[in-house]
Each structure stands twice: as structure tokens, then as C-alpha cells.
Amino acid sequence: MRNDFFKCTALAATLGLLLFATFYSPIAAQDLPKGELEIFAWWSGDEGPALDALIKLFESRHPQVEVINATVTDGSGINAKTVLNTRMLGGNPPDSFQVHAGQELIGTWVRSERMEDLTALFQSQGWIEAFPSDLIQLIGTDDGIWSVPVNIHRSNLLWYVPANLKKWGVTPPTSWEAFFKIAPKLRAQGVKPLALATNWTASHLWESVALAVLGPDQWSALWKGNLDWTSEAMISVWQVFNGILEYTNDDAPSLSWQQAIDMVVNGQAAFNIMGDWAAAYMRTTLKLRPGRDFGWLASPGTGGQFMFLADSFGLPQGAPNRGAALAWLTVLGSREGSDTFNALNGSISARLDSDLSKYNAYSKTAARDFKRDRIVGSLAHGVVANEGFKNDFASVMAMFLKNRNPHKAAQAGETIAIKNGIIR
């Protein structure tokens, strides 16, 4: 299937180069873009400096373009996507916008024919070879390539403070069975075994639990409609998840993900499961040293598996400043742009030729694991399911957090899988 994809990609790219010469010429030195560039993102706070560095790099290459940074602040893009929906549907798109690579973009804006094909841009910049083939497939369809990946994040990570664990006499659990053994010991010392935050972080935790219970083959089968959502395996996922919730903090809905990390750092909680943007928060905001002041492992039961998500930017149909947008995408996909952003952001480059000497201790281990581990996609961050399913799953999660009924949750999962085309 991969070979077929690349044959189609190569053919499309060859034909597209003729169009590129005409329509993508704003990238050429003799035809530099001028005017404005409005970019739409949710990177702010701890991730803000990385975006600022990327904008600064763009401005150094294109000083005649004024960058309008229309960032909408929140934890995982939920608020930003609401604003973006209004603008896209209202015929007022930004020039380029941040989106999770995969079905979050393809199942929404590509399906509704509101994005431009970037195949010719990829071909002209040599990106077909620069990015992993699996990632190219993820951001493409038979009809084209739809976004430029900026980074790779890992979702399935367990964070802790080594000095605290030593004081409490426990070690990081590599399975949920091990977690359930040490959790009572932690609780007896007045420590919350696992810090949790607002509801989207519960979905984030759930996907790591599901990967541990199902394994990578069944996890992938779930999103292809080849695993019954009401099967014993899926009910077991909800049962294990329910057991884990018994060892979390009651005030979770009122906390941000950063505050959950703070609980771990301050010794109120032993562990937190969060993506590797937590490393950027601890390193840049809290000034902690990776590998010394804080540690990490794959979330329990997922060793040797890398649950990933990728932030990317696309080109909407009807972008007001199309030439500037193409120049922006060119900077994003370049090696310099990728390393400039990711070295500050706590993520790793999506490119195969990044300069790891610029990265911190965590990022170096992430790059190593990305090359050797089994790669699977994230649900909570838009890789394996479209936006409709994600929104419906948030409602299922909210229901489960109230009634804690695994069988009802499994049935609700099947209902929304049918509704959103996962089960046909």
C-alpha cells in the first residue's frame, strides 16, 4: 500500500510541478511576498517562545511581510478550533492555521474541500524524502498532501520526580498491575498516586490505558472498524480506566494540565500522564533539569510503543495572502525552521535529518524511541479519528466520569463510532 501511495504521489507531484511554476512562484527569491500573513495557532504560554522563534526566523527571510499572530490560548486547541470553525465556515479563513495532522484535518476541512493540495510544494522542497513515509501517508490522501508537519509529540508518557519516589519508597510502574500495587502505599503516605486535570486530560489518560490493555494491533484495528467497541477487550479498557480513577484527585475538573504537573513537582502526587509538552513546561517555566529534577517513562503497559501526534499547518482555499502563506509553510518544513521550533518546544522534528545536538536530554530519547518503537496514532490529539468523533467522545467521557459504568461507556463508544463512519 505504501508503494502504491508513493507512485500516486510521484505522479501527482510531477504533474503538479507545472502548476507550481505558475501558482507557487511567491517562494522564489525574485518574487518575495509582501503585505501581511495571518497565522492561527493555539501555541501560547510555555510553547509561546518556540512559536515566537519561528516567526522571527520567517521575518528574517521575509522582512516585507507583517506577521499577524492570531493565537487563541488554551491547552489542546479546543477554543482555537471553535474560532477557526466560525471563520472557515464564514468564508473568512486565516492564511494558515495550526491543526493536528491526520484525521482532524482530513476528516474535516479536506473532506469539505476547503484546503489546497501541497503536493507540488513537498516535491519542490525535497520533503517527500525528508519526512518519514508513514507520516507522509498520514497527512495525505489519494488526492494530495494537505499540511506541513512541524513536530512530533509523544502522548503516552508517565512523569515523576525521582527524588520524591525515592523518599516514598516506590519505583515508576511499567504496567498498570504494578501501579495498582504501589498506589495504596502512596495513598497511605498522603500522596495522590496519579494527578489528573480537566476532562480532555481524562481522554488523554484513557488512550494510554486503552493502548496498554489492547496492544498496538487491536488499538489500530479499533480505528479501522475491525474491533467491536462492545467487545470484552473494550469493556476491560473501561474497567481498568475506572480502577485508575480511584487513585486520582477529586478536584481534577478544575485544574489545568500544568497544575496537574505542579502536583507532581510539589510532591502532592506521584505521577502524571501527559504528552511531552510537559517536558517543555518543566524545563522552561519551572526551570527543572530533564533526567535529574524530573523523569519519564512510557505510560504503564506501553513500553516499546510510541503514541504520537503531529502539529501541522495547511493552506486554506481562499487564503487572503496566499503567497505569504506558502512562504510560511516553506520555512516550517525546512530543517532550520524545524530545529528552531522543536529545540525550544520540547517536541522533536518530523524531519529525518534534524540536528539532535540542539535538543535536550528528553528530546534525544524521544528521537531515539521514535525511530525504534512501534508507532501508533493518538485519539485525543486528532490522529486516528475525525473531529466529529473526538467531540462525541468528549461527551462519552463526561458521562463516564459521572456514572462510572464501563458497559454503558462501551455501548456509547460503538454508537459514536457508527455515527462518525468508523464502523460502516
Predicted regions and their residues:
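Conserved N-terminal structural module of periplasmic/extracytoplasmic solute-binding proteins
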Residues: 26-111, 125, 172, 253, ...
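A structural signal for short loop-to-beta-strand junctions that line the ligand-binding cleft
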Residues: 87, 94-95, 125-163, 192-193, ...
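Glycine-centered hinge/linker elements that transmit conformational signals in sensory
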Residues: 183-186, 224-254
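C-terminal capping/gating helix-and-loop segments adjacent to ligand/active sites or protein-protein/ligand interfaces
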Residues: 223, 347-351, 365-422
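Periplasmic solute-binding protein
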Residues: 106-111, 134-174, 198-222, 307-314, ...
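Extracytoplasmic/periplasmic substrate-recognition and gating elements
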Residues: 60-61, 66, 90, 168, ...
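Hinge/lid segment of periplasmic solute-binding proteins
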Residues: 100-155, 180, 291, 361
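Extracytoplasmic/periplasmic substrate-binding proteins
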Residues: 42, 55, 108, 205, ...
